[in-house]
Amino acid sequence: MIIYPAVDIKDGRCVRLVQGEFDKVTVYSDNPVEMGLKWERMGAQYLHVVDLDGARTGQIQNTPIISEMAVKLGIPVQLGGGIRTVETIETLLCKGIHRVILGTSAVKNPELVKQALKTFEDSVVIGIDAKDGMVAIEGWAKTSEFTAIGFAKKMEELGAKTIIYTDISRDGMLAGPNLKAMEEMVKAVNIEVIASGGVRNIDDIRNLKNVGVSGVIVGKALYTGDLDLKEAIEVAK
């Protein structure tokens, strides 16, 4: 199981939101690249980066920082937030981003998913953000008509190999992950499930490992010091 430290970028800074609310922001660093390098030094095998401005506007906004990250970090970076076209995917992969995450665009534009998976294969990951079991879109501002599990199965049929499953109600709350929802998702699909949202301590890492997810994205708990990255990586092995 891989631990993915999360670096969320807003206005060029490394921040954390509570439940995706843009007015509930805590700034942790003015230098997201340095933050990524810090997690790498502590043993991270992979970095999870989100362009929050991009998620909100539908277009990548923090390109210079993201490009610098891809160049300076020795570990792979997966990026989400505002990726809505095949051209954007191609540009990001050319800049050295290892994997891109399609969220809102996967819901609104299944043709894009089909084309992206066909062209870029494993370099495309599907982000499924759920609110009460329903898929949420556009920076979590709206709920779609899809159930999270139904949508995951649809993405698997289209050829997706990995999904990132976020429980919005838990995100940034340090309330513990929704283990039941994660377990249901793992059992429902035959592809890799990366869990996101609510991780607060080492016990949550152990519990998620038992559920059978292939990876865990950790944000706030690393920044508050409630979770030690080295210990989390050790437990995840």
UniProtKB/Swiss-Prot annotation:
Localisation: Cytoplasm
InterPro entries the record matches: Aldolase_TIM, His_biosynth, HisA_bact_arch, Isoase_HisA-like, Isoase_HisA-like_bact, RibuloseP-bd_barrel
First-level EC class: isomerase
Record bears the keyword Iron: no
Annotated active site: D8 (proton acceptor), D129 (proton donor)
The keyword Isomerase is assigned to this record: yes
Xref: HAMAP family: HisA
Name this polypeptide is given: 1-(5-phosphoribosyl)-5-[(5-phosphoribosylamino)methylideneamino] imidazole-4-carboxamide isomerase
Organism: Acetivibrio thermocellus (strain ATCC 27405 / DSM 1237 / JCM 9322 / NBRC 103400 / NCIMB 10682 / NRRL B-4536 / VPI 7372) (Clostridium thermocellum)
